[in-house]
Amino acid sequence: MKIAVIGAGIYGCHIALKLSEAGFNVDLIERESDIMKITTDISLRAHSGYFYGRSPETMIACNKNSKLFLKEYPNSLFDHDKHYYIIAKNGSKITGKEYLATLDKYKLPYKKTKVPLINPDFVDVAIEVEELSYDPNLLREEVRIKLKKSKVNLILNTDVSDLPFREYDLRIISGYASNNDISRAITGKTIQ
């Protein structure tokens, strides 16, 4: 089976590597000049689930996957000083009480705190958590090494509209903000 993975961010690279390890013929296609250039530098957190207080399924998945991420890419992770999550008194779609109840239910550890430089009059609840960060340059290099050792065919500087997609048995879109543009180029339709 020949597979195209479109988008060489961390997810696209990881998917391509795992499919290649499973014995599939994989082309990893990226329009930029290098892997992980667009979104990798934005978050810098190996999300452990705290961000998703209104979605227990996502919270659980993130918590599980952050542990897998640590095993898979240990050289790019480091323990950062402090990570805070804050629920505002007004305008939030979840209350502090609901948020803490969800964290307790799914056993995500936290410590209630006051956050420096944040006016406590606007805060329903603030917590400090232990959550790893990643260095985007170290992560990029770690992934680059894995790709070079693999059988993944990395195709850079290539727009999806330039590719003969009928040659692929499966096409996986991993383009983040570009998902609809990629889908439209391949199928003529946007992702719903």
What is each stretch, according to the model?
Residues 43-125:
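Dinucleotide-binding Rossmann-like beta1-alpha1 core, especially the glycine-rich loop
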Residues 2-27:
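N-terminal Rossmann-like FAD-binding beta1-loop-alpha1 element of flavoenzymes
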Residues 24, 108, 152:
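Short phosphate-binding/catalytic loops that engage adenosine nucleotides
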Residues 14-18, 22, 46, 75-79, ...:
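Active-site substrate-recognition segment that forms the wall
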Residues 20-41:
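Glycine-rich FAD pyrophosphate-binding loop
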Residues 11, 34, 178:
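Conserved Rossmann-like nucleotide-cofactor binding loop
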Residues 134-192:
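Predominantly flavin-linked oxidoreductase catalytic cores and closely associated redox partners
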